[in-house]
Amino acid sequence: MAQLLDGKEISKVLKEEIKEEVKRWKEQGVNPKLAVVLVGDDPASVVYAKSKQKVSDSLGIDFELTVLPADSSEESILALIDSLNANPDVHGIMIELPLPKHISKERVMAAVRPDKDVDGVHPINRGYILSGEEGLFPATPESCIEIMLRSGVEIAGKHVVIVGRGETVGKPLVFLILKHNATVTICHSRTPDLGAFTRQADIIVAAVGKAKLVKKDMVKPGAIVVDAGINEIPGGICGDVDFEEVKEVASLISPVPGGVGSLTTALIMKNVLKGITLQRKEGQ
């Protein structure tokens, strides 16, 4: 029976560390601040924004939410981003998705200064992931790494199979794991005989967006299984791993909910603080 990779407990420790770092910045006269931009009134986006505000408040990070009408022009959104980019009191900027259909997501996300891009989606930050340079990286792949390292998992030398090639989790995770000296195989929804690959893995990371895709017979005994999926099913949510089955053969497994997702908001806040350091290097 597998032991849990307990994201909730790790998140508590991480938040305490962030509080201490916020305190140190405030002692230097810097009040860390996150600005969130919401266009329209998508109910899920409103909930996400409010949950970030709650976490932000609890950590001592200032929070500013700007809500623009759904019919806002792209130019008005870009003008707001320009003003936030130029404001030295704003250290992190986040654009809530989805944006209205008439707005170019790519243009808007690329307008955010890379050193304030707490979502880690700016093309320059994506490039930094590949090159190994310091930048702001997406919270979910960082969470997959963090949940393992803080649970005592040795990544170096392991064969890690990532199931999923998405822009926000699968692809960046390849390069973040390579930095930890693992051997990486990436699979996806079109991979024939997926189990032939996952059965070779010391560590499986599932991030493909298919409910309970990874079954017991796809996991070698003693493997570590990290579930970064989140899928709505009748009666709740589940991951990309069939948790009840796979926990019988894995040595460690992250649950959904209560695993990887528990760390993501805290890691966004950590990016706000990392952004301060990057901005100071650039002389703002």
UniProtKB/Swiss-Prot annotation:
Give a Pfam family name. Answer: THF_DHG_CYH
Tell me the InterPro entries matching this sequence.
Aminoacid_DH-like_N_sf (IPR046346), NAD(P)-bd_dom_sf (IPR036291), THF_DH/CycHdrlase (IPR000672), THF_DH/CycHdrlase_cat_dom (IPR020630), THF_DH/CycHdrlase_NAD-bd_dom (IPR020631)
Q: Which UniProt keywords apply?
A: Amino-acid biosynthesis, Histidine biosynthesis, Hydrolase, Methionine biosynthesis, Multifunctional enzyme, NADP, One-carbon metabolism, Oxidoreductase, Purine biosynthesis
Name the GO cellular-component terms.
cytosol
Q: Which reaction does it catalyse?
A: (6R)-5,10-methylene-5,6,7,8-tetrahydrofolate + NADP(+) = (6R)-5,10-methenyltetrahydrofolate + NADPH; (6R)-5,10-methenyltetrahydrofolate + H2O = (6R)-10-formyltetrahydrofolate + H(+)
Query: Under which EC number(s) is this enzyme classified?
Result: 1.5.1.5, 3.5.4.9
Highest taxon, organism lineage: Bacteria
Q: In which pathway does it act?
A: One-carbon metabolism; tetrahydrofolate interconversion
- Summarize where NADP(+) binds, as residue positions: 164-166, 189, 230
A single Gene Ontology biological process assigned to it is:
purine nucleotide biosynthetic process
ATP-binding as UniProt keyword = no
Q: Name one GO molecular function term.
A: methylenetetrahydrofolate dehydrogenase (NADP+) activity
Q: What's the subunit arrangement here?
A: Homodimer.
What's its job?
A: Catalyzes the oxidation of 5,10-methylenetetrahydrofolate to 5,10-methenyltetrahydrofolate and then the hydrolysis of 5,10-methenyltetrahydrofolate to 10-formyltetrahydrofolate.
UniProt record similarity statement? Belongs to the tetrahydrofolate dehydrogenase/cyclohydrolase family.
Output this protein's name.
Bifunctional protein FolD 2
Q: Tell me the organism.
A: Desulfitobacterium hafniense (strain Y51)
What taxonomic lineage is listed for the species of origin?
A: Bacteria, Bacillati, Bacillota, Clostridia, Eubacteriales
